[in-house]
Amino acid sequence: MTEPAAHFASHAAAARTLRIWDISPPLDERSEVFPGDTAYSQELHFSLSPGCPVNVNRITLSPHTGAHADAPLHYASGEAAIGAVDLQPYLGPCRVIHCLDCGPLVEPAHIAHALENLPPRVLLRTSRTASQSWASFTAIAPATLALLATKNIVLIGIDTPSVDPAASQNLPSHQQLLRHGLRVLENLVLDDVPEGDYELIALPLKLMRADASPVRAILRELS
């Protein structure tokens, strides 16, 4: 191959569009929240008219609606709000691990097959079709988070509403997150994502006093 042709081929390869997976559920009035939490609502605050050149919505929602990032403040008073946390955990190489039909908790044995050369972020796919329902879902065993912490991960994500069961009062898995300084994403949609390694982009909003933030989470193929 001549030098100009080689340069063109290299440039074409670099310019190839990498595939993106949108792993966020839609946000609207059908979005489920923890029983008693603030439901999503939306209305027009300003409306296009002869005296108004724009539409502007007013939106009310819990910061735990849809795909979201919990801040340490969510499970420990005096800890950091979501607008104060480091953004680095929410951006970079990650691994999607399939632990389908594993029951009420993701145990260490369910992820043991995928721990070699682990990148710093792990997303767990527990169901064939993600659901935001609080009625029944898979959470993460504290022992699983403790194991992942030994692998030097910085973030864990899951395709269910919470890393703890809905009825939990002491939130042992959230406490493991706090103990090991791990960040967390909940309510992801991993239905169409093969097991493997990706780039994660899921930045929270800079909400300076909030205990969580919605994210628009995506995965991008590495090459």
UniProtKB/Swiss-Prot annotation:
Key word Ribonucleoprotein present: no
EC number, as in UniProt: 3.5.1.9
List of residues binding substrate: F34
SUPFAM superfamilies with a match to the protein in the record: Putative cyclase
Residues involved in Zn(2+) 1 binding: H64, H68, D70, E186
Coiled coil: none
A GO term for molecular function: arylformamidase activity
Pathway note: Amino-acid degradation; L-tryptophan degradation via kynurenine pathway; L-kynurenine from L-tryptophan: step 2/2
Cofactor: Zn(2+)
Keywords: Hydrolase, Metal-binding, Tryptophan catabolism, Zinc
Name of a matching Pfam family: Cyclase
Disulphide-bridged cysteine pairs: none
Binding site for Zn(2+) 2: D70, H174, E186
Cofactor details (free text): Binds 2 zinc ions per subunit.
Function noted in UniProt: Catalyzes the hydrolysis of N-formyl-L-kynurenine to L-kynurenine, the second step in the kynurenine pathway of tryptophan degradation.
Quaternary context: Homodimer.
Family: Belongs to the Cyclase 1 superfamily. KynB family.
Protein name: Kynurenine formamidase
The organism of origin for this protein: Polaromonas naphthalenivorans (strain CJ2)
Top-level taxonomy: Bacteria, Pseudomonadati, Pseudomonadota, Betaproteobacteria, Burkholderiales
